[in-house]
Amino acid sequence: MLALKQALSLVSTKVAGGAAWTPTDEGKLEAWYENKVGITRNGSTVSDWADQSTNSRDMVQADATEQPAYNTVTGDLTFDSSNDTNLQTTSQMSFSADFTLGIKMFPTSTNGTFVADNTTANELFKISADDAITIKIDGVTAILSLDTGEFDDDYIVLTRVSDVFTLYRNGVAQSNPQTLAGTIDIDAIGIRRTDVNGFDGTIQEVQIYSISNATLTANINARLSTL
């Protein structure tokens, strides 16, 4: 794993002037919920995770009983399905073409939705098994499985290029791409419509783009590997 992280750090593209890549370098960045940044706390929980893109799609939760817990050291947001903890934005994101989602998370149970829509039904990304992610778009389902092992404290990238989804786990593309067309709708972290299939575990960062290419995937992997 150390060798993998070192290799990924070497592929991180530099922008003009020699600065390290960040998601805001991408013109097609739709939302960025950055680790340890943009957090509004309500005691030990999070009421607002501010979007670090220019789109102001903050993820918020006014109900204190549904706010995820926050770890000030790691930047972990802990979600608990028994309390329906979640964050939502009023600015729904919709993607009918290429798409990339990067996330650093540690699921502790299955059937948990990490990113989805709590306004439109049948739109979700969830941990459906110890080794599988289910994607549902416009009510149609695809399942992306790991080649080996089970989900743990991982950084995950999901790409869609010409309607073909690929799952990357800790920088490694898994060998079971799936075809799934339709319009992806997203407005929530940790829950789907209506307030079901809540996520159990921690989430450190979420990045969402309306584009996908190999360089972007490498850069996301390189960044998430450092968290």
Describe each model-derived feature in a short phrase:
Residues 41-44, 48-49, 58-136, 164, ...:
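Extracellular glycan-recognition modules
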Residues 52-54, 116-124, 170-173, 226:
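Short edge-strand/loop segments of extracellular domains
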Residues 136, 183-204:
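Extracellular glycan-interaction patches encoded by glycine-rich segments
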Residues 169-188:
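Short, solvent-exposed beta-strand-to-loop segments that form ligand-recognition rims
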